[in-house]
Amino acid sequence: MKPGEIIAASGEIELNAGQPTVTIEVSNTGDRPVQVGSHYHFFETNAGLSFDRDKVRGMRLDIPAGTAVRFEPGQTREVTLIPLAGKREVYGFRQKVMGPL
């Protein structure tokens, strides 16, 4: 082993196993691209993204940590979301919640 080397276990790793999911259709109605990170509270994303916000309160994208999804102007795509974990308190972002979910 070398310093800093990571030796991963063999086999497949299933991300967010057992988490309930919600799949929604999202449209970018703006004139600029919008990028949403893996742990961003999806309910509070850019107002130019059109979708049922009430349906996704307390949820984030079901993608690997540190990655993001980009929505080009005029683009519509399906995304899958999972619940935020931990204490289920949201602070910051666009300040739409600022407390427990």
Swiss-Prot record:
Molecular function terms, GO-annotated: urease activity
Alphabetical keyword list: Cytoplasm, Hydrolase
Coiled-coil stretches noted in the UniProt entry, renumbered to this chain: none
One matching Pfam family: Urease_beta
CC terms in the record's Gene Ontology section: urease complex
Class of the enzyme per the UniProt entry, highest EC level: hydrolase
PANTHER family: UREASE
HAMAP family xref list: Urease_beta
Description of how the protein assembles with itself and partners: Heterotrimer of UreA (gamma), UreB (beta) and UreC (alpha) subunits. Three heterotrimers associate to form the active enzyme.
Family as reported in the entry's similarity comment: Belongs to the urease beta subunit family.
UniProt protein name: Urease subunit beta
Organism, scientific name: Allorhizobium ampelinum (strain ATCC BAA-846 / DSM 112012 / S4) (Agrobacterium vitis (strain S4))
Name of the gene this protein is made from: ureB
